[in-house]
Amino acid sequence: LTQRGAAYYPPQSEWGSQDEALVARDQRWGLVWGHGPHRVRYSVAYDPEEFKFALNTMTEEAKVRLLMHAYACDAIVEDGRISGVTFQSKSGRFAILANVVIDATGDGDIFTSAGAAYEKENVLPWLWFGMGGVKNPEAAIDAGGWFFHTLGEGRVLLPWGATERVTRKIDATDPDDLTYAELACRKRVMEEVDRLRRESPSFANAHVCHIADQIGITESRRLVGEYMLGRDDVDTPCDDVIAITGHWTKY
């Protein structure tokens, strides 16, 4: 991504710095936000379309067999363990058996169908979007707008959607709730676009570049596993760590 000019992130030598100028620079990119005290974090602003291409290239190079346009349905449970998953495609229903199944649905669809225990919380829906053709984005950001600088000339990213957000919490596993949220959020997006064109000179001739493909949610189902992470675990390094976040957590 960096080679293609499709990513921006602070160099490792700056990570952890509390230099106000560096923090302010990264805030403009949306790499630092939330409650202080602030410091430079490892966080990346990237072009989502370029990111998709990079992921496709990486999986091909790793000899991963991809199967798109097929949707996971139910876990196949044998002797108390998941031995495979059924899928639905336009060619019909089929199953894939495996020694290890990883539920990467984000909503626990597979472990739920296997009967695993979970917690669930209703959340506010979001719909991020980007605009192009913005005249002098830096001046627009300086004026106090709720948007970030992003990759590409004259473009900004509007996080969490419009200023006037949807205030009804939804069950992110309920299709009726998701339908309501998508329609409501898309309406808010266009209202925000019209407002910015009307009120901000920088956006007078701006246009919508991209609206997020899916409703943004922070969580839905949480697996009740052998060990449940709690607030005391937030700053505790783990030997089996698999991911790092540069941002806040409410837990």
Where in the sequence are the language-model features?
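A structural motif corresponding to the C-terminal end of an alpha-helix
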Residues: 58-65
